[in-house]
Design a protein with these regions (language model features):
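Trp-centered recognition loops
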Residues: 1-5
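Short beta-strand segments
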Residues: 24, 47, 281-283
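Ligand-recognition surfaces built from glycine- and aromatic
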Residues: 31-72
Length: 409
């Protein structure tokens, strides 16, 4: 990646550098006011990341003490020293084998460098997963920032975006939509305006050309491209509604995810008439289709009978786990078991007792011949529920793993 830096000074002077090398120094007094942005042309194609602007950029927050500690811990992976003339002569004295010896050492250093890169990636992923788990740890649903948690899923795979920028972007979208509300509008009118503004005016829409692309599950890319899956578009709708003081929840139906607004008074109905009357006091939003629908249309989208569906709000933790399961499926289609394992690791960090995800991870470990890890997951399943009818095939696989040399814990 090349580092591009542009500085615009008060006297109209514009300084542009590439990799800290000044390439443009001009004065243009006509450019006053306006906005800072990034212009990307189709030809030639280019990619950008870490776009930032500020009056002054802060210096690195890395503490020397931390650097020393990290390098001390990893010094066995790398070694380097400058060579003087005397050292060079000693190498020359070795003779014709010296070049090959240096080449071999170079390959060793490359391998060590690769090991450090992998370690860095793993540590970064684990830190993000820990942050995601913490974001979902609140017992009160209102305290969970669903958009932040969804953005952290994208952060697992892509570190090169500023998460807070997207939270601010959501705030800005909500403010823009709020400006369209009539002064004395009620919640139902505001929900309809939110639907119209987000999907008709702003152009957010369901992805149809490449539905299973991972970008549709990355909230930062969904917000950039204004295109996504039913669940990611619904999350954006829910979070914008929350910023507009509208109580909208997720509605996780089989095969399709929706958003739902339910009027406060509907919660006070007697149990006998709850199902019949609640439908009259709710608004169901199909974010993928960009429209308001009723229960009959929701049932049609799932292919199930309406009486077989539970129109109950989905907990935020379950919404995040559903996003991760989507990514597990996408990685499976792409024959990417490493990514599958990463997403399953995240699900199990959120819900360690998720038996289906643990069994799925055990099978992936088994296929990858990581037998001890597979055995660890299988033992967890057997010990956590000894009477489960699903245990017999697990015991068969366990015996097979031990015969193949996996160590029992």
């Amino acid at each position: 990646w090349n580092l591009l830096h542009v500085r615009f000074e008060e006297n109209g002077r514009i300084l542009c550098s590439v990799n800290k090398q000044l390439v443009i120094d001009v004065i243009d007094l006509e450019k006053e006011g306006g906005f800072i942005g990034l212009c990307k042309f189709r030809e030639p194609t280019a990619s950008f990341r870490n776009f930032r602007f500020a009056k002054r950029f802060s210096s690195s927050q890395v503490k020397p003490k931390s650097v020393f500690k990290l390098r001390k811990l990893t010094r066995n992976l790398s070694a380097h020293r400058a060579l003087g003339e005397a050292d060079l002569q000693q190498i020359l004295d070795i003779g014709k084998t010296a070049p090959q010896m240096l080449q071999d050492y170079s390959e060793e250093l490359k391998q060590r460098s690769d090991d450090l890169q992998k370690l860095s990636k793993e540590i970064r992923e684990r830190l993000v997963i820990a942050e995601l788990v913490e974001s979902l740890s609140y017992s009160d649903e209102k305290s969970i920032d669903l958009l932040k948690s969804a953005l952290l899923i994208a952060r697992i795979d892509n570190e090169h975006f500023n998460l807070n920028d997207y939270l601010k972007k959501a705030d800005a979208l909500a403010d823009q939509i709020k400006s369209e509300f009539p002064k004395h509008s009620n919640d139902e009118q505001r929900i309809k305006i939110l639907v119209s503004q987000l999907f008709n005016e702003m152009g957010f829409h369901g992805s149809t050309l490449d539905f299973h692309h991972r970008s549709n599950s990355y909230m930062n890319e969904v917000m950039d491209d204004r295109e996504g899956l039913p669940i990611t578009l619904s999350i954006l709708f829910i979070e914008l509604a929350d910023r507009l003081n509208l109580k909208v929840t997720g509605l996780g139906l089989p095969g399709h995810f929706l958003a739902m607004y339910r009027k406060p008074q509907s919660l006070e109905l007697d149990q006998e008439n709850l199902t019949r009357n609640t439908a009259k006091h709710e608004i169901i939003i199909d974010a993928f289709g960009g429209k308001i629908i009723d229960r009959q249309e929701a049932a049609r989208l799932t292919g199930l009978a309406i009486e077989d569906l539970a129109f109950e709000p989905s907990p935020k933790k379950e919404i995040i786990k559903r996003m991760l399961r989507n990514l597990v499926q996408v990685a499976g289609r792409e024959k990417d078991p490493i990514s599958q394992t990463r997403y399953l690791d995240t699900i199990l960090a959120i819900s360690p007792d998720d038996r289906y995800s643990r069994a799925q991870r055990a099978m992936i470990y088994y296929i990858r011949e990581e037998f001890e890890r597979a055995l660890s997951d299988i033992d967890y399943l057997l010990e956590s529920d000894p009477e489960s009818p699903e245990n017999q095939p697990l015991r068969v696989i366990r015996n097979r793993l031990i015969n193949q040399g996996a160590a029992a814990f």
